[in-house]
């Protein structure tokens, strides 16, 4: 239960993250709220059991620390909590649990006062997946098992509360969603009960609706209020190193604060011991009508997708699609070891072109092909041939196959014999 609150314990005192601001003279000021448990005039360790059972003769104390850069620390008077609330009811709290709830409420209130409004340049791009249909072995070498979640084929969205109390909902590319009032209304209610500095990372989705329809609704100024927001992660801008398993614990606690939400949901988590268990879950999710599965490294930090960075702490599992496309040209890779390695260029019926990586050719073969294949040889032997292409999905914007890899030609052709 202690892990459900932002912050950490040091010397038996739990401190929430500092809320920082700037003084009129330009110095950095920090405000911190803390909770300690005292029994017989001694500060004792805070345990999870204290959130469900009171400790005899123990009281909880809340206090704040305030200091300005290069200045002394000022500590407030103690606020003592001697009993819980709603005693005898389902939602009863112990002394310690009530103290933490009171401290969180004060923390949020102070954060609202000090937190500046977001601007578009202040949006944090969400974490992106690096691995496709590969789960690194390191995921299973951690003390905590990796987490598997359903992968919905929806539109990525991140939510946060601005300094004026309004809700900002933005896309993977940091574009604000102007509609979705049904979701924003519930987010505003939810932020009354949780840390206002938290970002909620998820997907806009409606089960069994095509991605094109979902994207149209998400980007409309006036939508049909049918989309739901499925939250699969959360993060704090000043605590990006927080491991994934703790973020998931905090996310669970967030949703416990308000359980009557209709359009906002926490994505279900499944712990797995090995790759086979993850693959079985992927197959189950696909049968249920979902796109596949996401695997999260339990100890992985939150790594924002700045400059299209893809995090090595995420893996996506989903079935591959394949189709035949007309080969119209060839080119080479642009950087690293792909520079000088041949790539095929295919064309869609609407004349849009896309690049395809040969799947079964070694780099040595690809280098040799690009070096020796002439336009004349290409036109004579390969131009206009049907190429079988394996891909992850079609781009909802362009219809172009994504992560395209050439499996082979429809008619038997050994491209290495051409040169």
From Swiss-Prot:
Subcellular location: Virion
Name of this chain's protein: DNA ligase
Region (AD domain): 121-317
Entry annotation: catalytic residues: 151
GO terms for biological process, alphabetical: cell division; DNA recombination; DNA repair; DNA replication
Classification via InterPro entries: DNA_ligase_ATP-dep_cent, DNA_ligase_ATP-dep_CS, NA-bd_OB-fold, NAD_dep_DNA_ligaseB
UniProt comment concerning the protein's domains: The N-terminus domain (NTD) plays a critical role in DNA-binding, catalytic complex assembly and catalysis.
Further remark: Consistent with its intracellular location, ASFV encodes its own replicative DNA polymerase and three base excision repair enzymes: a class II AP endonuclease, the repair polymerase Pol X, and an ATP-dependent DNA ligase.
EC number: 6.5.1.1
Similarity-based family: Belongs to the ATP-dependent DNA ligase family.
One annotated GO molecular function: ATP binding
Species this chain originates from: African swine fever virus (isolate Warthog/Namibia/Wart80/1980)
GO cellular component: virion component
Annotated segments matching region OB domain: 318-419
Keywords: ATP-binding, Cell cycle, Cell division, DNA damage, DNA recombination, DNA repair, DNA replication, Ligase, Nucleotide-binding, Virion
């Amino acid at each position: 239960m202690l892990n459900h609150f932002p912050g950490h314990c040091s010397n038996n005192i739990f401190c929430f993250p500092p809320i920082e601001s700037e003084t009129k003279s330009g110095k950095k000021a920090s405000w911190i709220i803390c909770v300690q448990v005292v029994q017989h005039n001694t500060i004792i360790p805070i345990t999870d059991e204290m959130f469900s059972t009171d400790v005899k003769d123990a009281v909880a104390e809340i206090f704040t620390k305030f200091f300005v850069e290069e200045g002394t620390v000022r500590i407030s008077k103690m606020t003592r909590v001697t009993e819980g609330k709603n005693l005898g009811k389902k939602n009863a709290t112990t002394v310690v649990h009530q103290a933490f709830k009171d401290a969180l409420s004060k923390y949020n209130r102070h954060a609202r006062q000090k937190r500046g409004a977001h601007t578009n340049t202040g949006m944090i791009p969400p974490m992106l997946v690096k691995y496709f249909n590969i789960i690194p072995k390191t995921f299973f070498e951690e003390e905590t098992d990796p987490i598997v979640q359903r992968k919905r084929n929806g539109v990525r969205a991140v939510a946060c509360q601005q300094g004026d109390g309004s809700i900002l909902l933005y896309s993977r590319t940091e574009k604000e969603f102007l509609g979705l009032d049904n979701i924003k209304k519930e987010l505003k209610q939810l932020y009354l009960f949780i840390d206002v500095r938290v970002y909620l990372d998820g997907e806009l989705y409606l089960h069994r609706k095509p991605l094109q329809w979902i994207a149209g609704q998400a980007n409309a100024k006036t939508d049909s209020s049918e989309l739901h927001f499925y939250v699969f992660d959360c993060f704090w801008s000043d605590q990006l190193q927080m491991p994934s398993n703790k973020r998931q614990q905090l996310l669970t606690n967030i949703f416990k604060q308000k359980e009557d939400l209709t359009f906002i949901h926490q994505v279900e988590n499944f712990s797995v011991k090995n790759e086979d268990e993850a693959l079985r879950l992927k197959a189950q999710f696909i049968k249920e009508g979902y796109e596949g599965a996401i695997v999260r490294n339990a100890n992985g930090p939150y790594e924002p997708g700045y400059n299209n960075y893809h995090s090595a702490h995420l893996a996506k599992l989903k079935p591959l699609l394949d189709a035949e496309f007309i080969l119209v040209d060839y080119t080479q890779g642009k950087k690293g070891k792909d520079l000088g390695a041949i790539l095929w260029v295919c064309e869609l019926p609407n004349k849009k072109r896309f690049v395809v990586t040969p799947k079964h050719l070694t780099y040595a073969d690809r280098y040799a092909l690009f070096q020796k294949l002439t336009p004349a040889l290409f036109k004579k032997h390969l131009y206009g041939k049907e190429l079988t292409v394996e891909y992850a999905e079609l781009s909802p914007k362009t219809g172009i196959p994504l992560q395209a890899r050439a499996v082979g030609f429809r008619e038997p052709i050994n491209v290495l014999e051409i040169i």
